[in-house]
A protein has these predicted regions:
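Active-site or metal-binding loop neighborhoods of secreted/extracellular toxin and effector enzymes
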Residues: 162-278
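Short turn/helix-capping motifs enriched in Asx and small/polar residues
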Residues: 1-50, 56-60
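Glycine-rich, acidic and aromatic/proline-enriched surface loops and short helix-turn segments
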Residues: 1-3, 25-27, 150, 180-185
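Short pre-active-site segment immediately N-terminal to the catalytic Zn-binding motif
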Residues: 124-141, 165
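A structural signal for well-ordered alpha-helical segments within the folded catalytic domains
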Residues: 20, 25, 135-138, 142, ...
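Auxiliary, metal-adjacent structural segments of Zn-dependent hydrolase domains
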Residues: 54-125, 133-134
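Flexible, surface-exposed loop/gating regions in the mature catalytic domains
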Residues: 153, 157-158, 162-165
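Active-site recognition of the HExxH zinc-binding catalytic motif
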Residues: 138-154
């Protein structure tokens, strides 16, 4: 039986609710990590974004049907190639499924629209509280994908850290592919060397070729985004981590030592006195 030893400091704000109805009597939908407020603002924006993704999904379904109708109207036989539409539809369906997953998560997610932002997923140190910041709806889909990777253990955060660890070029490729399914034009020109004809063109190699305003490659080896160049997840070992940061491995080893095949989770907890959140 849970008990509180003080009155909720914001009890008057929710006078329409019973003083005994924790989280509005709906602790699955509402989470109160600090005992101060129910984050309804994010839920309203979350609902808007969910409907926007549904609308995009329905648009692609309609376009696919138009394509099929036109194919047969021209007297063609057999099955039309709908792979382009199928990839877009399946990706948007995955994005909607991810929204359900993070809504039910043990983590708390706050949405933060910031005009001009390129998008981030940040952790509030020493909590299970995460903020998705995005400058437009397409970037929300990108960061939503990273939140899903957190839920799946593909990336992780330390308890005291703000930024993701174990994030690699394959994680970024998945996020950009989801972003493309929502808004193809939002990723056009990011990699000036490769023209994107379909979602299948967004690969790890494409991510490495993305250029920033200075002509640099933020996702490449030694890039400003500090992205792993090989597949990583929270179960990766120290050696696998070094392999993903090959261009930096000497400096990393000199600074932190050589931990061989020790799992990164153990390295963080035992060496840096910090654990993973995933």
């Amino acid at each position: 039986l849970c008990r509180w030893n003080a009155i909720d400091p914001l009890a008057e704000k929710y006078c329409s609710l019973s003083g005994y109805a924790y989280c509005g009597n709906n602790p699955v939908r509402f989470i109160d990590p600090y005992g101060l407020t129910i984050a309804e603002g994010s839920l309203q924006e979350f609902g808007r974004l969910r409907q926007t993704i549904r609308d995009k999904l329905n648009s692609w379904i309609a376009l696919k049907q138009q394509y099929i109708n036109a194919f047969y109207a021209q007297g063609n036989s057999g099955e039309p190639n709908t792979s382009y539409f199928d990839m877009m539809i399946q990706s948007l369906q995955r994005s909607l499924a991810l929204m359900d997953i993070i809504e039910m998560s043990t983590h708390t997610y706050k949405l933060n629209f910031s005009e001009g932002s390129k998008g981030t997923l940040k952790h509030t140190p020493n909590t299970r509280y995460f903020t998705l910041t995005y400058g437009n709806d397409a970037l929300f889909v990108h960061e939503l994908t990273h939140a899903g990777q957190l839920e799946n253990g593909e990336i992780g955060f330390t308890k005291a850290g703000k930024n993701a660890l174990m994030i690699d070029i394959y994680d970024e490729a998945a996020a950009y592919a989801a972003q493309y399914a929502f808004s193809p034009e939002s990723v056009e020109g990011l990699n000036p060397s490769v023209y994107i004809y379909s979602m299948a063109d967004i690969t790890a190699e494409w991510v490495i070729g993305i250029e920033d305003a200075t002509g640099g490659h933020p996702y490449g080896p030694g890039g400003s985004n500090h992205t792993g160049q090989a597949l990583l997840n929270i179960n990766s070992t120290w050696n696998e981590y070094l392999g993903a940061y090959h261009s930096e491995r000497r400096s990393i080893r000199e600074q932190y030592g050589n931990w061989g095949d020790t799992p990164m989770k153990d390295v963080m907890e035992n060496v840096f006195n910090d654990g993973f959140i995933w």
